Amino acid sequence: TKGQNIAIGRDALKVQTDGGEFNVAVGTYSLDENTFGDKNVALGYVALGKNTEASYNTGIGTESLKLNTTGTNNTGLGYAAGDVVSSGSQNVLIGASTDPGAADATNQTVVGYGTTGQADNSVTLGNADVTAVYMAQDKGATVHAASISLENDETITNSTDTQIDMSSTTLVVGNGSVDPTI
């Protein structure tokens, strides 16, 4: 292979010839089809296996980012993390079977077993079984948002523990909104 690559395992960096430098492939079929991708790290069976030209990806775990061919700056951590990504970029996928919402997704951060991202430029915490999200162990964290949306008949309960600073934001409830100047 071209200079400064490390390949350990059956068919790791197998196709690598003249292109691609500074790659690390550890595991059977890891970075197996890489031809011109640079600075990738693949640890695990078939990790980044279909990668051809993509650079700056990190796939740690069996089948992590296995279908990525041209997407850049992706991180997949866990069994089959990001295994649907083919051309998406800037995605962070943490947990077994985590995936962005589409193969060409951009800038999705997805955390938790079996969780699927919802939209580009978004963060998704937890799969459909998650019933609560805590921003701090003691619930003392401050959450900043430009808007807060409540769907259907959902409401904020326990108003003594809830404080919403409306000085520079809009609270969206259902199909309406609350004017912060009122």
Enumerate the predicted regions with their spans.
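Glycine- and small/polar-enriched repetitive beta-structure motifs of secreted/surface proteins
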Residues: 1-142
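Register-specific beta-strand positions within repetitive beta-rich fiber domains
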Residues: 10, 120, 129-130, 136-182
